[in-house]
Amino acid sequence: MKTTLALSMATLLISSSAFAADFSATKDKLETALAADIRTDKEVARDRNRKPVRTLEFFGFRDDMKVVELMPGGGWYTKLLAPVVADKGQYYMAIGTSRASKAVAGQAGFDKVKVTAEEAKIYRPEGSKFYALEADGLGVSDMDMVLTFRNYHNFSESGRAVMNKMAFDALKSGGVYAVVDHTRRHMQATDNENRRRFDPVLAIKEIQAAGFKFVDMTDLHYKPDDELRYEVGRKSVTGNSDRWTLKFVKP
């Protein structure tokens, strides 16, 4: 019994050490990306709030992964993810990629960035506060990770279902679906103040319904001063919104 326990502990320690060593190389590359000239002063100013290194470590991001970022916005995370995986992995951006593509076009170290699911359509139906999403898939498979930051709230229920299915189909077994968004109170009805927030319990329910296993969450982006009452774009809330950070795995 003691021998078995000792062996188990030794295995755990070795695994933990290997995990730390694996991320050490990735962390070094992330630190280099964080210091790169391509990043604007406004982007750098958000580092303290967004905690990208710790967030990506939580998700299990590594420099040899094939990753897809959904709706990369202006490319804040693109400028960190793409150079880290450039040598040993692959970065794809998908859905609403025009601003991010423009931000890194022609820049040294970003020539391997690929755009996928270019046929995807995002539109807001007349009278709706949320976007619809039409797409056959992400156009890639066997991915290690699909990430999306502060986008889940933008879509209608059917749009979210499409997005979750796209992520599921693109990932390999064991692949990670990493999702971050602004927190809304559980079961709170939608209004103009919370429209860009989302209930994390509902997110978990929907993503599990797509076939994913919910494996972990972190309070890295917990903000006790956010009353969850006001629009995230308000001056008093911007940069200080409470955000849920959820990790799912494809079985």
Give the residues covered by each predicted segment.
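Class I SAM-dependent methyltransferase Rossmann-like catalytic core
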Residues: 26-63, 76
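Conserved class I S-adenosyl-L-methionine
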Residues: 63-73
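A short glycine-rich, Lys/Arg-flanked "PGG" loop and its adjoining helix->strand segment in the class I
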Residues: 82-83, 161-174
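Conserved beta-strand signature within the Rossmann-like core of class I S-adenosyl-L-methionine
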Residues: 91-94, 174-186
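A short, conserved alpha-helix within the catalytic core of class I
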Residues: 130-133, 154-167
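A short acidic, Gly/Pro-enriched loop at the edge of an enzyme's catalytic core
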Residues: 136-146
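Conserved Class I S-adenosyl-L-methionine
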Residues: 190-217
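Core SAM-dependent methyltransferase catalytic element
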Residues: 210, 225-251
